[in-house]
């Protein structure tokens, strides 16, 4: 009886013991000042899975065995922060962890190199990026011994973290599955050779969101917004559609709305889903150039999403080449939706289809379009008109939605006409 009671008490005592959770290094300005005289560099790996979302665990146990929550058959995301001049924890970190684990059943490893990124000497943090990459490569070699695969590794690096990801990729000769650079740091990297910065050759698939041109690129508005755009693309139901183009100037005047090269997958999307276009993008690299540059516009606040449509017009004959047409988009309530049109001055020729890219701020059902024709001359022309054979509106953001049409329209000068839209003829869908 005494033995039985003793064993029960032992079991109770053990079950009451709580596991210690790892925490991101909490540093401050004092640590930045201390670094001026005593430089430090430490790296910690904090592992999360859906089994331990609220409690970060070490990737390896004290005996160097692999954490039992790590599944070598699943994708592994490595999240690497950047320069932290006053040692603060990245404000986006916890939210990023949540949206990534909500999106996919993965191994998620936060690379905490705050002791090394926290310094007033930016150049020192830059030099530490290569050292962190070497430390990471040692842990990766250990994972490979346990059966992990480089092809399943997706590095997401922010600022200096993007270049750390690139240096890791170089160590493994470009065999990492994917690297995503979110606003890669420019100072001390811009203009450098491919060996000294993140490069498209550092992984099998490299995508970058920043304000310069490189890799498969998405153009953004301001510093570090890339992080929030990437998260928004995960959290919202909006497709952040982007358009392949040689320059932002050409994109703005509507010269780059053709995504036929991307086949049935339509235009590529920003963020986590960009890898759906991996095979097509690699094929484009082999056939044409070393990288694909794409553009998109966003709103200034979360969730940042806008909605793209292509408005195509086919005229019956060449009527007034010196005129232009204005457009209004009306929703089902008859309210005008603000639209941005990407277009240049275009002459209309018989049975030629002219496409205009339109961007709306709201995801609404467009029920009608208002058109007004103006000629360039100041003199009123009562006989001037455009004869439109077909007008078609198709969503680019949601290509699965059927296009809407109207047929046989005559526009007189300065006279606004509202056209109700309905399903297009079967042969045109």
Task: Locate predicted features.
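Flexible, membrane-associating and regulatory peripheral segments of lipid-active enzymes
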Residues: 2-110, 117-128, 138-150, 196-200, ...
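Glycine-rich nucleophile elbow surrounding the catalytic serine of serine-hydrolase chemistry
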Residues: 81, 155-168
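Solvent-exposed loop/turn segments at secondary-structure junctions
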Residues: 83-86, 114-118, 160-162, 185-188, ...
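Short, structured coil segments at secondary-structure junctions
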Residues: 104, 172-175, 202
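A short glycine-rich beta-strand->turn/loop micro-motif centered on a GG-aromatic cluster
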Residues: 110-112, 181
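Short, well-ordered amphipathic alpha-helical segments that serve as non-catalytic structural scaffolds
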Residues: 135-140, 206
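Alpha/beta-hydrolase fold nucleophile elbow
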Residues: 147-159, 179
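The feature captures the conserved acid-bearing segment of alpha/beta-hydrolase catalytic domains
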Residues: 177, 181-217
């Amino acid at each position: 009886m005494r033995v039985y009671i003793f064993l029960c008490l032992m079991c109770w005592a053990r079950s009451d013991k709580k596991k210690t959770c790892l925490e991101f290094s909490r540093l401050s300005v004092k640590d930045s000042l201390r670094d001026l005289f005593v430089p430090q560099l430490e790296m910690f790996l904090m592992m999360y899975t859906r089994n331990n979302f609220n409690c970060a665990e070490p990737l390896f146990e004290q005996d160097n065995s692999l954490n039992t929550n790590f599944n070598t058959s699943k994708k592994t995301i490595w999240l690497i922060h950047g320069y932290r001049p006053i040692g603060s924890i990245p404000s986006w970190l916890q939210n990023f962890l949540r949206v990534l684990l909500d999106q996919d059943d993965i191994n998620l490893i936060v690379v905490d190199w705050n002791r090394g990124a926290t310094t007033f000497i930016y150049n020192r943090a830059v030099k530490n990026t290569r050292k962190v990459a070497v430390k990471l490569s040692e842990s990766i070699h250990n994972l490979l011994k346990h059966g992990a695969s480089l092809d399943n590794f997706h590095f997401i690096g922010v600022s200096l973290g993007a270049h750390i990801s690139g240096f890791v990729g170089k160590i493994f000769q470009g065999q990492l599955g994917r690297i995503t650079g979110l606003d890669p740091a420019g100072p001390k990297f811009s203009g450098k050779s491919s060996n000294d910065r993140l490069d498209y050759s550092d992984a099998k698939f490299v995508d970058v969101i920043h304000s310069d041109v490189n890799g498969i690129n998405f153009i953004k508005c301001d510093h570090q917004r890339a992080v929030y755009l990437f998260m928004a693309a995960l959290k919202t139901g909006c497709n952040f559609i982007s358009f392949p183009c040689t320059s932002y100037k050409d994109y703005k005047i509507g010269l780059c709305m053709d995504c036929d090269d991307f086949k049935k997958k339509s235009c590529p999307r920003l963020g986590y889903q960009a890898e759906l276009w991996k095979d097509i993008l690699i094929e484009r690299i082999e056939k044409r150039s070393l990288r694909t540059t794409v553009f998109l516009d966003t709103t200034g606040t979360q969730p940042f999403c806008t909605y793209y449509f292509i408005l195509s017009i086919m005229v019956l004959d060449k009527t007034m080449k010196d005129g232009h047409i204005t457009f209004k988009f009306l929703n089902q309530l008859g309210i005008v939706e603000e639209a941005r049109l990407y277009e240049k001055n275009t002459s209309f020729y018989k049975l030629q289809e002219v496409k205009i890219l339109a961007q709306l701020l709201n995801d609404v059902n467009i029920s009608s379009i208002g058109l007004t024709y103006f000629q360039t001359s100041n003199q009123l022309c009562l006989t001037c008109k455009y004869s439109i054979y077909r007008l078609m509106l198709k969503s680019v953001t949601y290509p699965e939605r059927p296009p809407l049409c109207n047929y046989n329209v005559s526009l007189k000068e300065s006279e606004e006409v509202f056209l109700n839209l309905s399903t297009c003829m079967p042969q045109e869908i």
